[in-house]
Amino acid sequence: MTGPLRKNHPLFSIINNSLIDLPSPSNLSIWWNFGSLLGLCLIIQILTGLFLAMHYTSDVSLAFSSVSHICRDVNYGWLLRNIHANTASFFFLCLYFHIGRGIYYGSYVNNETWNIGVILLLLTMLTAFVGYVLPWGQMSFWGATVITNLISAVPYIGSSIVQWVWGGFSVDNATLTRFFAFHFLFPFIIAALSIIHLFFLHQTGSNNPTGIESKFDKTPFHTYFSTKDITGFIILFMLLSSIVLLSPNLLNDPENFNPANPLVTPIHIQPEWYFLFAYAILRSIPNKLGGVVALLASILVLFLVPFLHTSNNQANTFRPASQSLFWLLTSVFIILTWLGSQPVEDPFILLGQISSIAYFALFFLAFPLASELENKLIF
């Protein structure tokens, strides 16, 4: 057998075709780095999570103490815990950039890749939610109580489902144990789905910043884009290590340094920053079921993006009206994130309702209408 081993070996050839000799568009920008950064974040989370799980105890009377024990007594336990907690924030930051790039450059036209990506987003959000409950601090306990209690809004069977999820009549030991089991299991499902995500991506080939077919302008992934990805890794490590070593609790809620107490409700219950946009949409509707539907719709709307694409151009690169709307959507997303961290009082209630309407109106009305207008002006 002649030729390099990486091309002839049954296992190495798969890796070679995915990471080394993969034909890639020659004009990919930095916005295509976030997929590999997400893979890196997932690996960091699985490794640090594995070592944390060795010392963690999923019992309501011991969970908070076990996290304290990890930080105080385990060799570099403080570092593991801080890396795990802060990489979650970087994970979601990269995830939102990745989705934003997909919307801006029209990557959603590859339906299978996009749909699996949205499923990955939902699974990652679920994993982060159950993980946030594990330290069993005040915000962990009350966050779990409030968010799981939303299921009771489902007509007729809601209350039964909530008790089934809790494993009892309140958030207690059974809830913590099963949440730990889910938090351990889901990252491996995410890893498996990520491979399928890549498989579908490599069936169609990557999109590029122009949104124009690039079959005749390809370049090998290695060394050009692998070097570019490693540059992204170095920048991520620098930012992550700066936060982990200089200000590890910058993104944490101070309330979570108090052990869970079912008798004392925190003044302001809120999730981590990466869920605040959806939380703001939930709170903006003065009806429990309506709020839950809006909360789910704020994420599930991504499934509809390919069907709402009416433009003759794939990317927004040559579509100024759609570009303006995209940056308006980004602004609305940031405003919703800020509103989610504010108390439920005027003027934040009204601002939340306006921003929520704007969020959905951009997806369902503004983008399709702007695309139709651009079609008439350009073609």
Swiss-Prot record:
Can you supply one Gene Ontology CC term for this chain's record? respiratory chain complex III
* Recorded GO MF terms: metal ion binding; ubiquinol-cytochrome-c reductase activity
Source organism superkingdom: Eukaryota
Which cofactors are required for activity? Answer: heme b
Q: Which annotated residues bind a ubiquinone?
A: 202
- Mostly located where? mitochondrion
Does Iron count among this protein's keywords?
Answer: yes
Co-factor: note: Binds 2 heme b groups non-covalently.
Ranges that cross the membrane: 34-54, 78-99, 114-134, 179-199, 227-247, 289-309, 321-341, 348-369
Tell me, what does this protein do in biology?
Component of the ubiquinol-cytochrome c reductase complex (complex III or cytochrome b-c1 complex) that is part of the mitochondrial respiratory chain. The b-c1 complex mediates electron transfer from ubiquinol to cytochrome c. Contributes to the generation of a proton gradient across the mitochondrial membrane that is then used for ATP synthesis.
The UniProt entry lists membrane topology as: Multi-pass membrane protein
Question: Where, by residue number, does heme b b566 bind?
Answer: 98, 197
Q: Does the keyword Chloroplast apply?
A: no
Subcellular localization, per the record?
A: Mitochondrion inner membrane
Which positions does UniProt annotate for heme b b562 binding? 84, 183
One annotated GO biological process: mitochondrial electron transport, ubiquinol to cytochrome c
Task: Name the gene behind this protein.
Answer: MT-CYB
Miscellaneous comment as given in the Swiss-Prot or TrEMBL entry? Heme 1 (or BL or b562) is low-potential and absorbs at about 562 nm, and heme 2 (or BH or b566) is high-potential and absorbs at about 566 nm.
Question: Which named protein is this?
Answer: Cytochrome b
Q: Which family does it belong to?
A: Belongs to the cytochrome b family.
| Quaternary context | The main subunits of complex b-c1 are: cytochrome b, cytochrome c1 and the Rieske protein.
Which keywords does UniProt give here? Electron transport, Heme, Iron, Membrane, Metal-binding, Mitochondrion, Mitochondrion inner membrane, Respiratory chain, Transmembrane, Transmembrane helix, Transport, Ubiquinone
